[in-house]
Amino acid sequence: MKAVSIEAGERSKAKRVHGVNRGISVFDLVLRIVALVGTLASAVAMGTAGQALSFSTQIVNFEAQYDDIDAFKFFVVSNSITCVYLALSIPISIFHIIRSRAGKSRVLLIVLDAIMLVFLTSGASAAAAIVYLAHNGNTSTNWFSICQQYTDFCQRSAGSLIGSFGAMALMVLLIILSSIALSRR
């Protein structure tokens, strides 16, 4: 640390920046835990979504499950991988609380957070497009809405998008916070 002369009436700001970085690191940890819970809840909600219609016969079975649609499979996989990444990044976030001036690990987290954000966004966007079609259909291509028959399945799949889009917003905040902490170093 540089020696700086302080005139009467002035306070040193060296410890203040260190304390701000520690506060940013604590907030980073909290955001990672909340994003982890959001992605986990989204993956579990979509992965367990399924509904069979009550008028199914022995010959024809009317059933909707998440694994019938590839976009929903990708949604579950992208949320699961992001959840595992967030769990593995928590020790690094704790390390940043202890050593708030660490720089290389912050750069690594920024890059990996950005990659996971893109991965999570692509999975959530693909699932959102299918949920939109399930709710509204597409009359120009004669795709009818299935949500009048499969109400529980549609509600569960639409609800699982909430946690994923919330985690996306938190990932953006994580990237911004890490960039701010890195610039204050």
Swiss-Prot record:
Q: Which residues cross the membrane?
A: 33-53, 74-94, 107-127, 161-181
Keywords for this entry?
Cell membrane, Cell wall biogenesis/degradation, Glycoprotein, Membrane, Transmembrane, Transmembrane helix
Write down the PANTHER family for this protein, in alphabetical order: CASP-LIKE PROTEIN, CASP-LIKE PROTEIN 1U1
Predominant place of localization: membrane
Q: How does it assemble?
A: Homodimer and heterodimers.
Q: Which residues lie on this side of the membrane: Extracellular?
A: 54-73, 128-160
- Identify one Gene Ontology CC term for this UniProt entry: plasma membrane
Instruction: Tell me how this protein sits in the membrane.
Output: Multi-pass membrane protein
Q: Which residues are glycosylated?
A: N138
| Protein name (Swiss-Prot/TrEMBL) | Casparian strip membrane protein 1
Q: Name one GO biological process term.
A: cell wall organization
Q: Which organism is it from?
A: Solanum demissum (Wild potato)
Which sequence ranges are listed under topological domain Cytoplasmic?
A: 1-32, 95-106, 182-185
Cited function? Regulates membrane-cell wall junctions and localized cell wall deposition. Required for establishment of the Casparian strip membrane domain (CSD) and the subsequent formation of Casparian strips, a cell wall modification of the root endodermis that determines an apoplastic barrier between the intraorganismal apoplasm and the extraorganismal apoplasm and prevents lateral diffusion.
* Localization per record: Cell membrane
- Is Cell wall biogenesis/degradation one of the keywords UniProt gives this record? yes
Look up the domain of life of the source. Eukaryota
Family of this protein: Belongs to the Casparian strip membrane proteins (CASP) family.
The answer, when asked if Glycoprotein is one of the entry's keywords, is: yes
